[in-house]
């Protein structure tokens, strides 16, 4: 049996303080993505340069530069992500992840996440527990385990295609809207708190 393939899409705007940690975290995974498209949404800091350096050493990383929308709303990020989704649309993959540019996780994160999907055929959207580092202290952001934080949503391709991806909503809530649509199609959504 072949190992499932996954792709990641990240929207990044002026993330030079965090993007290297995220790149390191993904590049250290026990199961690497088939492709990771990082959409630089008009970054004016060193974000693009940092991604380019990592892409030289890791061919699965691709930088996609786009013009930043003049409109400043939650939907600007969704527009950037949609351009990344279009970039991977013709690739062969089984899962797609939406990953924020300031996230780090354990080296077996995606391996363990894929195991959950393998064991649960109706699992449509899943992710791990989000923790925030504040003044050197790790603070868990516990939420309803039947919901998944938008920063780490990982979807079965069939579920992603049925939901139509992230809707552009002016005042936010795109991740929740995608989850609700997934549930309406009979998919389960789940946060696995042991995944960090």
Locations of the language-model features?
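Short beta-strand-to-loop acidic/aromatic patch adjacent to the donor-nucleotide binding site
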Residues: 92-104
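Active-site nucleotide-sugar/metal-binding loop of Leloir-type enzymes
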Residues: 78-95
């Amino acid at each position: 049996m072949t190992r499932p393939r996954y792709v990641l899409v990240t929207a990044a705007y002026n993330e030079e303080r965090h993007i290297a940690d995220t790149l390191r975290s993904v590049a250290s995974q026990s199961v690497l993505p088939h492709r990771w498209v990082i959409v630089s949404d008009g970054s004016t800091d060193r974000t693009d340069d940092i991604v380019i350096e990592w892409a030289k050493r890791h061919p699965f990383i691709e930088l996609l530069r786009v013009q930043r929308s003049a409109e400043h709303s939650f939907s600007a990020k969704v527009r950037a992500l949609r351009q990344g989704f279009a970039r991977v649309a013709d690739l062969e993959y089984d899962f797609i992840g939406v990953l924020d540019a300031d996230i780090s996780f354990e080296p077996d994160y995606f391996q363990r996440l894929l195991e959950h999907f393998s064991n649960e055929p109706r699992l449509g959207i899943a992710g791990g527990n989000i923790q925030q580092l504040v003044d050197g202290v790790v603070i868990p952001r516990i939420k309803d385990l039947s919901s998944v934080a938008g920063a780490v949503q990982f979807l079965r391709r069939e579920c992603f295609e049925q939901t139509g991806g992230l809707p552009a909503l002016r005042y936010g809530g795109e991740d929740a809207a995608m989850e609700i649509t997934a549930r309406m199609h009979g998919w389960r959504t789940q946060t696995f708190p042991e995944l960090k």
